[in-house]
Amino acid sequence: MKLKVSFRNVSKQYQLYEKQSDKIKGLFFPNKDKGFFAVRNVSFDVYEGETIGFVGINGSGKSTMSNLLAKIIPPTSGEIEMNGQPSLIAISAGLNNALTGRDNIRLKCLMMGLTNKEIDEMYDSIVEFAEIGEFINQPVKSYSSGMKSRLGFAISVHIDPDILIIDEALSVGDQTFYDKCVDRITEFKNQGKTIFFVSHSIGQIEKICDRVAWIDNGELRMFDDTKTVVKEYKEFISWFKKLSKKEKDKYKKEQLASRKQVLSEEDLAHLEKDKNKQKSLANIIPIAGLSILVVLAAGAMFV
């Protein structure tokens, strides 16, 4: 099978700040005592056609993994090899709240490299799949979380990505829409596409995924076939639920403390590199956004 995604010793670190002034200081004088691992030393290989589930309690690092896979954030250290174009589906991911659903469809498709002609050809199908009716002409800021998820999912599956990352996007819809999404995911699986599926629903994980990665405290605790991992994870959840509130708080506090670590010079260098990338993006994004809005405006003149 063809290798689609490979993580090698991937970590994502952030610096923690207690107040805004500390963040400003950190731009010039990084604090070595405020390092936090969102994800630490993760390695795995995923092959073409596989559907991989991510499980873990809140704050374990699942969404950070989604953002790394979608190339939204770079790793602090380690290497990520990706043979294909990823697309992230999460509540509100990639949607502009100030624009209407109609404009968001065009904007997101343009950003993914589609032409206006291609967008026009698939527009009606996207709107039909999203099932949000006349709200398609309303600003996204007026949408419920479920409506945002519907629109985001509809756009992403019509763009036809090589690698699909679904982060809790099916947790807010009704059963009918959920069934339709699962059918589309099954179609993608049959086409040999690679899918990453993040969910708190063990039932969804069992139904959809071939293998499961259990993320615990920012680390990859287990990565195996679905049945094996789900069995172990269920036992952990059963144990965790039996803890008192005080015991749960203590457990979470200990886990959080273990993810804080003094930053090495190499770590600080990686963080500085991330900041420089963010500054570059900050300069590029307004220009790109303006260019796309000009295209939208020009297109509107001929509608």
Curated annotation (Swiss-Prot):
Broad class of where this protein is predominantly found: membrane
Matching InterPro entries: AAA+_ATPase (IPR003593), ABC_transporter-like_ATP-bd (IPR003439), ABC_transporter-like_CS (IPR017871), ABC_transpr_TagH-like (IPR015860), Bact_Polysacc_Export_ATP-bd (IPR050683), P-loop_NTPase (IPR027417)
Entry membrane topology: Peripheral membrane protein
Listed EC numbers: 7.5.2.4
Family in the record: Belongs to the ABC transporter superfamily. Teichoic acids exporter (TC 3.A.1.104.1) family.
Protein name (Swiss-Prot/TrEMBL): Teichoic acids export ATP-binding protein TagH
Enzyme class: translocase
Keywords of the record: ATP-binding, Cell membrane, Membrane, Nucleotide-binding, Translocase, Transport
Binding site for ATP: G56, I57, N58, G59, S60, G61, K62, S63
Domain ABC transporter stretches: 5-242
Function: Part of the ABC transporter complex TagGH involved in teichoic acids export. Responsible for energy coupling to the transport system.
Alphabetized GO MF terms: ABC-type teichoic acid transporter activity; ATP binding; ATP hydrolysis activity
Cellular location(s): Cell membrane
Gene source species: Bacillus licheniformis (strain ATCC 14580 / DSM 13 / JCM 2505 / CCUG 7422 / NBRC 12200 / NCIMB 9375 / NCTC 10341 / NRRL NRS-1264 / Gibson 46)
Substrates-to-products reaction catalysed: ATP + H2O + teichoic acidSide 1 = ADP + phosphate + teichoic acidSide 2
Assembly: The complex is composed of two ATP-binding proteins (TagH) and two transmembrane proteins (TagG).
Gene Ontology cellular component list: plasma membrane
